[in-house]
Design a protein with these regions (language model features):
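Secreted/periplasmic carbohydrate-active enzymes, especially glycoside hydrolases
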Residues: 1-195, 240, 255-256, 272-282, ...
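Substrate-binding clefts and catalytic carboxylate motifs of secreted carbohydrate-active enzymes
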Residues: 10-18, 24, 29, 238-239, ...
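Aromatic- and acidic-residue-enriched carbohydrate-binding clefts of CAZyme catalytic domains
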Residues: 138-143, 151, 198-235, 241-245, ...
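Hydrophobic faces of well-ordered beta-strands that scaffold small-molecule active sites
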Residues: 138-140, 173-175, 195-197, 255, ...
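Active-site beta-loop-alpha junctions enriched in small/polar residues
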Residues: 142, 178, 200-202, 260-262, ...
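Acidic-and-aromatic substrate-binding clefts and catalytic sites of carbohydrate-active enzymes
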Residues: 173-182, 262-267, 293-295, 315, ...
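Short low-complexity, flexible loop/linker segments enriched in glycine and/or proline
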Residues: 187-191, 210-214, 300-303, 376-378
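Active-site neighborhood of glycoside hydrolase catalytic domains
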Residues: 190, 225-326
Length: 411
């Protein structure tokens, strides 16, 4: 436990250890320290802007190849700044045709190979467009979870997940509720998924403890006081958002930045959103928990692009649409149930399809969370979950709520 534990109260198993690869990379002193790729689509021309930072001055040769290996753009840069390359008649990336170009950055001492997707995400008249086409997020929330390896996820398991999602017509994933391993985004670029990248911030537990004697109304009204609206937490909250955005800025599957989950709203999230929009104005921002704040105070929502909700009734959705709200409406979570699925699926789907300002939703959630505990007499795997390890405090079967079993067998 540490002070960071207050910001990591996601609904999942609690496990200890190092879950992802850790490595040391030795590089020459004369090297690229960072690069930031931005793209501009103008009719039949794409401009690729690559902002570079160096440890020491050096010459960089830049080339872009199409998927057949043909060079479509060349450039160079000899000092920190931005190189601009142009691609004529570009192939645009989308979820049905996730076309990727190869980027090669060559210096005297090393070669860096990355990929680029050409796509444009924007909001016009409360409707979200990808490459000028109205889109619907047919999304799902995905946790890192394996019945044998826990939070450690292999490329093979992720490939299984993404393949199953494609087979069942999902086109979007929310990284609930923390940034995933870097290869997750590379695979989403390749497979064609739009991603909501979410910061590792969730703090609904502390407010339940500090306000446990309050009425539900007062708890939600003052939820934000301890963390979201206390400047003591500004550095921690903004830092987590910055680390996510800085690390993942060159992954084009990411169309939306999420400030976190279920942590209420206040001055610290205002700062995080302000930094994010200044750094990356081309992507959309969302934060469902922005609606939980001190009702006696006024807050800045100008850097939030989407009005997002969890589990609203159909009547609430219709009320927002009738009032002609100023932002697109997104269901970041819906259709949550343990055991058999909940009803009203068709009604929600129909409402999403019938209203351009309702840009889609993300089903909660992808997989059941459980730990493999050997084999039963009938040959089936025994899966243990809340309470099966003798713990006094647990959530029962609350995390057995996925569309697939822990081993990814479809329900």
């Amino acid at each position: 436990w540490c002070d960071g534990s207050y910001l990591e109260d996601q609904d999942k198993f609690r496990m200890s250890g190092i879950f992802r690869d850790v490595y040391i990379l030795k590089r020459p002193k004369q090297a690229i320290s960072d690069y930031h790729i931005k793209t501009r689509i103008e009719d039949m021309l794409a401009k690729v802007e690559i902002e570079m930072k160096f440890y020491f001055p050096l010459n960089v040769k830049i080339s872009i190849e199409d998927r057949n290996g043909a060079v479509v753009a060349l450039g160079s840069i000899a000092e920190e700044g931005t190189a601009v390359l142009e691609i004529a008649s570009p192939e645009l990336w989308n979820t049905e045709n996730p076309y990727l170009y190869k980027l090669i950055l060559e210096t005297e001492n090393e070669v860096i190979v990355d990929h680029i997707a050409l796509r444009k995400i924007e909001i016009k008249d409360q409707v979200i467009y990808l490459n000028g086409q109205k889109i619907k997020f047919r999304g799902v929330n995905r946790h890192d979870s394996d019945p044998v390896t826990g939070f450690t996820i292999s490329l093979e398991q992720l490939t299984t997940d993404l393949t199953l999602m494609k087979q069942h017509n999902f086109n979007a994933i929310r990284s609930s509720h923390y940034p995933n391993a870097p290869f997750f985004y590379e695979m989403c670029d390749k497979y064609g998924f739009m991603v909501i990248d979410e910061a590792d911030i969730e703090a609904h537990g502390p407010f339940m403890i500090y306000r446990k004697e309050d009425t539900d109304y007062n708890r939600f009204k003052r939820w934000n006081e301890k963390i979201a609206d206390d400047p003591v937490w500004e550095e921690a909250i903004v830092d987590r958002v910055k680390l996510m955005v800085e690390r993942d800025k060159n992954r084009f599957c990411i169309v939306m930045w999420s400030m976190g989950n279920e942590s209420a709203y206040g001055c610290n999230f205002e700062k995080a959103l302000e930094w994010t929009k200044n750094f990356d104005p081309d992507r959309i921002t969302q934060y469902e928990s922005a609606r939980y704040r001190n009702y006696d105070e006024t807050y800045d929502y100008s850097n939030l692009d989407v009005y997002s909700r969890m589990y609203p009734a159909l009547s609430e959705i219709q009320e927002y649409l009738d009032k002609d709200g100023s932002k697109p409406l997104l269901l970041v979570e819906y259709c949550h149930s343990m055991g058999n699925g909940p009803g009203d699926f068709e009604d929600y789907f129909q409402m999403i399809q019938d209203n351009d300002k309702m840009c889609g939703g993300f089903v909660w959630e992808w997989c059941d969370h459980a730990i493999a505990h050997g084999t039963a007499e009938n040959g089936k795997t025994i899966y243990a979950y809340g309470g099966d390890h003798g713990e006094e405090i647990h959530d029962g079967n609350f995390c057995m709520d996925g569309l697939v079993y822990p081993d990814r067998t479809v329900h």
